[in-house]
């Protein structure tokens, strides 16, 4: 397995589960959003404020292409990374893709106090999460080798599930 790539909505647990998977697999962990922040010296909300979502998505596309070209990485992506065709192609080519599925209710619970999510600065974050989920869910599924449920499951349980199911996948 070249890389293990985690996709899914905000609050699905991509970063938490990614760190645990990297430790288990003895691989390097990378978070595309954190890498963008390190490179720019600015946080994601600031980038959204200054460059808008299109500016951020340009940075994200370049970062995903770079990270997917590596070997031996567990990569956690931003929730909207799948919206661009080029990103989906890079993610699919970059390794095994695991879609961490979380219900909108679970997403609301996990993101309600997080001020670092510019797309949720709305009057109704739950409605925003629902709309994002409806637009993105088919795209996550399109590129996923595995779909793993994260609702009401401790991260370690999700990690064990992923590790077990990865072994059952045919080579590609």
UniProtKB/Swiss-Prot annotation:
Pathway: Metabolic intermediate biosynthesis; chorismate biosynthesis; chorismate from D-erythrose 4-phosphate and phosphoenolpyruvate: step 5/7. ATP binds at residues 11-16, 117, 153. Keywords: Amino-acid biosynthesis, Aromatic amino acid biosynthesis, ATP-binding, Cytoplasm, Kinase, Magnesium, Metal-binding, Nucleotide-binding, Transferase. One of its GO terms (cellular component) is cytosol. This is Shikimate kinase. Belongs to the shikimate kinase family. The gene is aroK. Gene3D superfamilies: P-loop containing nucleotide triphosphate hydrolases (3.40.50.300). Monomer. It is an enzyme of class 2 (transferase). Binds 1 Mg(2+) ion per subunit.
């Amino acid at each position: 397995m070249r890389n293990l790539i985690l996709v899914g909505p905000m609050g699905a647990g991509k970063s938490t589960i990614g760190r645990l998977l990297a430790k288990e697999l003895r691989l390097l962990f990378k978070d595309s959003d954190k890498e963008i922040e390190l490179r720019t010296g600015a946080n994601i909300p600031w980038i959204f404020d200054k460059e808008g979502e299109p500016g951020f998505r340009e940075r994200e596309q370049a970062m995903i292409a770079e990270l997917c070209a590596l070997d031996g990485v567990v990569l956690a992506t931003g929730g909207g990374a799948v919206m661009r065709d080029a990103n989906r192609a890079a993610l699919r080519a970059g390794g095994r893709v695991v879609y961490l599925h979380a219900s909108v209710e679970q997403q609301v619970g996990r993101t309600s106090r997080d001020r670092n999510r510019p797309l949720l600065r709305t009057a109704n974050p739950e409605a925003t999460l629902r709309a994002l989920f409806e637009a993105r869910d088919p795209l996550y599924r399109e590129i996923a080798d595995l779909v793993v449920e994260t609702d009401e499951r401790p991260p370690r349980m999700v990690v064990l599930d992923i590790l077990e199911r990865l072994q059952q996948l045919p080579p590609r």
